């Protein structure tokens, strides 16, 4: 029997680990420079926590068997877990709270997706306890700075407003609202064309409600009689005016996120490839989510975003030097079995400065084979150890510098 990773899981080998760590470290530095602190939440949560009062669909959760009666699952995203932690563990702390994370999430695949990847890596932030223009602008500026630090080239920012889009959906008959919303989420124009008149034309107009703020404002005129639409759109324009011009911005009022807890701005970052636009980040405002976890229904406003690490890695050029494995400086070789204790002590002494990398020779090889191993690994010094004599030091620096660099 050949053992493989479970369906939807994969191994990440050293070179890919190095690439991922390079990216995560740069994102982490940006997060920290804006005052964000790292939070780690459980991989396993109760199903009630993960589904966030019904705003996260249970079918996306990979459920696991626990020791108790309460259903458990692997987190499909982090926002719900952080909201739960903020209510249960961080109550009374000074607001706003700026939190960031870098971790894995799990999403169940079904039907045609069965067998696809089910574990994903994310890095993101949550800003809790702040609402209004300044908080929304901070998040969008933070997204842009991250992309700039990673030297991402061309990128597109799609900005919508979940509340405003819900107001527009509210103009449809109740029996059609779910259908129209699903079509928007799935970019399904064909199904909208099958709706009865006059709702078909109105749904298609909503589907196409994207472009520059000026273009969207003109198309939004047919909904000007809907209460609050004009004022809400004016606030959205004010926010976009604050966002730096390093990203091409498209206002998209047809934008619908898969999680239903968003109450304000929502956004996506797309990067073009040769064949498609790749989604590398998404986020938005969720001012009612924390009330789900509070015993009295009290809430704290929140906004955040997440980078999809795997997708972002495909769009970032990582310098080859960043992926080089740090080489060991010493190879410590016990000449006999009796010299092993002395070799272990000598290797530990060499490591005392905290920065020297030392390997212990483990295989029974000839001296020439030992030297060949050291040259292949670019180890410049060999310490030959006897049980009753001082170490003999052999320098191989000339041979090492002529070898190809070993990568992990």
Swiss-Prot record:
Record GO terms (molecular function):
histidine-tRNA ligase activity
This protein's pathway: Amino-acid biosynthesis; L-histidine biosynthesis; L-histidine from 5-phospho-alpha-D-ribose 1-diphosphate: step 1/9
The UniProt entry, under SUPFAM superfamilies, shows:
Class II aaRS and biotin synthetases (SSF55681)
Q: Which GO terms describe its cellular component?
A: cytoplasm
Q: Which UniProt keywords apply?
A: Amino-acid biosynthesis, Cytoplasm, Histidine biosynthesis
Keyword ATP-binding in the entry? The reply is no
User: Any S-S bridges, and between which cysteines?
Assistant: none
Q: Where in the cell is it found?
A: Cytoplasm
Q: Which Pfam families match?
A: tRNA-synt_His
* GO terms (BP aspect): histidyl-tRNA aminoacylation; L-histidine biosynthetic process
The domain of life for this entry's organism is Bacteria
Which family does the similarity line name? Belongs to the class-II aminoacyl-tRNA synthetase family. HisZ subfamily.
Task: Please give the HAMAP family that the UniProt record associates with this protein.
Answer: HisZ
What NCBIfam families does the annotation carry? hisZ_biosyn_reg, PRK12292.2-3
Q: What does this protein do?
A: Required for the first step of histidine biosynthesis. May allow the feedback regulation of ATP phosphoribosyltransferase activity by histidine.
Q: Cite any additional comment in the entry.
A: This function is generally fulfilled by the C-terminal part of HisG, which is missing in some bacteria such as this one.
State how it assembles: Heteromultimer composed of HisG and HisZ subunits.
Query: What is the protein named?
Result: ATP phosphoribosyltransferase regulatory subunit
């Amino acid at each position: 029997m050949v053992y493989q990773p479970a369906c939807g899981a994969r191994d990440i080998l050293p070179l890919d680990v190095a690439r991922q760590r390079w990216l995560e470290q740069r994102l982490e530095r940006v997060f920290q420079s804006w005052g964000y602190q790292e939070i780690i939440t459980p991989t396993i949560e109760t199903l009630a926590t993960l589904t966030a009062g019904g705003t996260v669909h249970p079918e996306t959760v990979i459920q696991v068997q626990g020791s108790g009666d309460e259903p458990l699952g692997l987190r499909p995203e982090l926002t719900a877990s952080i909201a739960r932690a903020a209510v249960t563990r961080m109550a009374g702390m000074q607001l706003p709270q700026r939190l960031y994370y870098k971790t894995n999430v799990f999403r169940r695949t079904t039907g045609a997706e069965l067998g696809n990847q089910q574990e994903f890596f994310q890095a993101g932030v949550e800003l809790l306890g702040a609402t209004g223009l300044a908080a929304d602008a901070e998040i969008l500026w933070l997204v842009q700075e991250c992309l700039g630090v990673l030297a991402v080239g061309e990128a597109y920012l799609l900005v919508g407003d979940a509340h405003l889009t819900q107001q527009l959906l509210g103009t449809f008959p109740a029996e059609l609202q779910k259908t129209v919303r699903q079509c928007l989420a799935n970019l399904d124009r064909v199904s909208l064309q099958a709706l009865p008149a006059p709702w078909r034309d109105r749904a298609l107009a909503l589907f196409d409600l994207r472009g520059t703020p000026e273009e969207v404002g003109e198309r939004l005129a047919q909904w000007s009689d809907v209460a609050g639409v004009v004022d809400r759109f004016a606030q959205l324009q004010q926010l976009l005016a604050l966002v730096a011009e390093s990203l091409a911005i498209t206002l998209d009022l047809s934008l619908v996120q898969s999680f239903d807890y968003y109450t304000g701005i929502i956004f996506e970052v797309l990067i073009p490839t040769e064949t498609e636009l790749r989604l590398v980040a998404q986020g938005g405002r969720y001012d009612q989510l924390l009330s789900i976890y509070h015993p009295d229904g009290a809430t704290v406003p929140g906004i955040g975003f997440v980078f999809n690490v795997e997708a972002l890695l495909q769009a970032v050029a990582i310098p080859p030097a960043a992926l080089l494995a740090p080489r060991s400086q010493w190879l410590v070789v016990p000449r006999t079995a009796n010299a092993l204790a002395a070799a272990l002590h000598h290797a530990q002494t060499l490591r005392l400065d905290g920065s020297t990398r030392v390997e212990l020779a483990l295989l029974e090889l000839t001296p020439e084979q030992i030297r060949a191993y050291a040259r292949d690994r670019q180890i410049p010094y060999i310490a030959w150890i006897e049980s009753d004599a001082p170490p003999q030091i052999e320098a191989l620096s000339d041979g090492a510098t002529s070898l190809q660099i070993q990568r992990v």
